[in-house]
Design a protein with these regions (language model features):
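Non-transmembrane, membrane-proximal soluble domains of secreted or membrane proteins
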Residues: 1-158
Length: 158
């Protein structure tokens, strides 16, 4: 009986490890949760001053929402990613536990202070994808939307 369990366990552990391994991503994006906004950093790209591209993303309030905008889901700075490209998200938190949730892309990853978690994604088509912090992290927890916009590789590079 123990031999059967061992024969099943070792290949299973190897498969679990390989499933979670990100194979040579083209882009890495650091997502850091704060009370109550997200910070992003494209570590593979540099701006004109040769610094990493980084920005904060806050929810757009109802008074600033444009016509047709989604209440409680729209942000001032979206994450822009190319379609059909392997992307690795490195997720962490600065203060309390958060959770980076993007159901349409199959992402839900907890963000812990002092710990880095990585998930990979391949976006198959252009579009705008909405998600939110999925961990109750304080009084303004509902004010932490996540918006990822997927564009063609040509648009992304310009």
């Amino acid at each position: 009986m123990a031999l059967i369990l061992i024969l099943i366990a070792f290949p299973s552990f190897k498969l679990l490890y390989l499933m979670d391994e990100v194979s040579d991503p083209a882009i890495s994006v650091l997502a850091e949760g704060h009370q109550w906004y997200w910070s992003y950093q494209y570590s593979d790209f540099l701006n004109r001053d040769y610094d990493n591209i980084e920005f904060d993303s806050y929810m757009v309030g109802e008074e600033d929402l444009e016509e047709g905008g989604l209440r409680m889901l729209e942000v001032d700075n979206r994450v822009i990613l190319p379609e059909l490209t392997h992307v690795r998200f490195i997720i962490t938190a600065a203060d309390v536990i958060h959770s980076f949730g993007m159901p349409a892309l199959g992402i839900k990853c907890d963000a812990y202070p002092g710990r880095l978690n990585a998930v990979s994604v391949l976006i198959n088509r252009e579009g705008t994808y909405y998600g939110q912090c999925s961990e109750i992290c304080g009084i303004l927890h509902s004010s932490m939307p996540i918006v990822i916009q997927s564009v063609s590789i040509e648009k992304f590079l310009t």
